[in-house]
Amino acid sequence: MKQQATNYYYGDEQVSVVELPYGNGAFSLVLFMPSDKKKTSLDELIADLDADRWNQWMSNLSSYSFDLYLPRFTMESSMDLTDVMRTLGVKDAFKSEADFTNISTEQPLFIGLIKQNTFIKVDESGTEAAAVTIVDMDTSALPPATTLKELRFDHPFGYVLKENSTGAILFAGRVD
């Protein structure tokens, strides 16, 4: 799909980043890809991506007017987070002795499964995203735009859907 608009852009010898604000500006889709896919791969960009680099990208975004070429994409995933939570130190909640009396006093409860399903779709009408986390309880204002001709997301790229007032990342993924 092609979009002709003014959006935020940052680019250097390694990365091209574009931020697409949504609606009243509460949310944005941030897309990033290697500036030169022969010199840097998406895997290398992601491996080097940390909070400092992310903040550098976000603070250097400037308003540009350009043609944006972006493929339509849909991503879905389902992930069992039980082992992840145990690794993070959540242990007692999985034991039959867990204390969930604020949820139910009739039967002892414990967590048997934590599963997250995610969905994101990007097309001409915008972005649709949803996340469902299942916990199974078992008994027991824009500055003037600079002109950039075009930006084509025609090789592997990453995407981040974020909430703008806090910067919280809601979804992140890659399109190969």
Feature-to-residue mapping (PLM):
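Mature hydrolase/peptidase catalytic cores and their serpin-fold inhibitory cores, especially
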Residues: M1-D176
